[in-house]
Structure formats: C-alpha cells, structure tokens
Amino acid sequence: MIFYLHGFDATSPGNHEKMRQLQFIDPDVRLVSYSTLHPKHDMQHLLKEVAKQMKHSDDPAPLMVGVGLGAYWAERIGFLNGLKSVLINPNLHPEENMQGKIDRPEEYADIANKCVSQFREKNTHKAMCIFSVNDEMFDNQQLASELSAYYSIDWDDVQPHKFHQLAAHLPKIKAFKLA
C-alpha cells in the first residue's frame, strides 16, 4: 500500500498521474487528501486517516509518498506511524514560504515545536528524498543539505517542482519500499 499526499495544489491533474505511476510499484495507491490551509487540522486529519486506512491493509510495509507540502506531511505522518516515506521536492519550511497562501502558516512552527524532539535522528534511513535540480520553488541544494545526514538523496535533472514524471525513480522507490 502506498499513501500519496498531494502538494499545495490539491486539484492539480498531475496528482492522478503520479498515483497511476506509483501503481507500477504497488496496485494499492491511496490518496490521502487534506485542506492545505489549516495545518493543525490537517495533521489531526492525516493521522486519523492513515491509521484508519492501515487497519484495512495487510501490507507489511506501507509507504508514504508526498510531493512539496505533501512531503512535509509524509515525513511527519510516516514517522509517527512507523512508516517509510519518500519525500519529493519537500517543503521543509512552510511556516516561512506559505505566508499569504494559507490562513495560519505559523501553525507549522507550532507543530515543529510540539513534534518529537530531533525526530529526524530517530527517523534516520526511514525516508528517501528526490530533489529536482530545476525546482523553480525552492533551493533544493540547501534543503538536501538539511536532510542528507538522515536520508538518502537522489537528484533529477529533468523534472520541475511539481515532478510530473516519476518513472525514472520508480525502481529506487520500489526497492526502498521492499528493503
């Protein structure tokens, strides 16, 4: 089972395409949608929804996959549920870069402060990151340096921020899920 968490643009047609591509790894791909506008509510909703979905699966190694803001959540929700995560062009600092886009971006800072201290150290090797060299939204070199001590980092020379095509990375994602 793969949980797919969309980015800030929840209605992008690319989400369906990414889910379809992930079905080459596992036919059971589930969209876990969230509002993107209310971080504290989103966290509660995602925790409940993932726990509920896991009760209805016999997959011994479910995987979280998130793009952009979805990767922010995939890392945290995956950690709190003991799941591996794939973070694609993760938005690591929505409290800074979501100003003016959502109602309460400061809630992300509050969530970070209330999260398990040093959770990345406790989550080492439980996530893999895929970064676009040509990401038009974030400085992925800087973000990769924040995560490289904890997670493996892969680079893509073609895809933009929304990462329309996962095909080149599906074998690595599958190997990571099954390892």
Swiss-Prot record:
InterPro entries recorded: AB_hydrolase_fold, UPF0227, UPF0227/Esterase_YqiA
Any one Pfam family match given in the protein's UniProt record, by short name: UPF0227
TM spans (from-to): none
Family stated for the protein in its record: Belongs to the UPF0227 family.
HAMAP family given in the database record: UPF0227
Name assigned to this protein: UPF0227 protein Shew185_2404
Highest classification ranks of the organism: Bacteria, Pseudomonadati, Pseudomonadota, Gammaproteobacteria, Alteromonadales
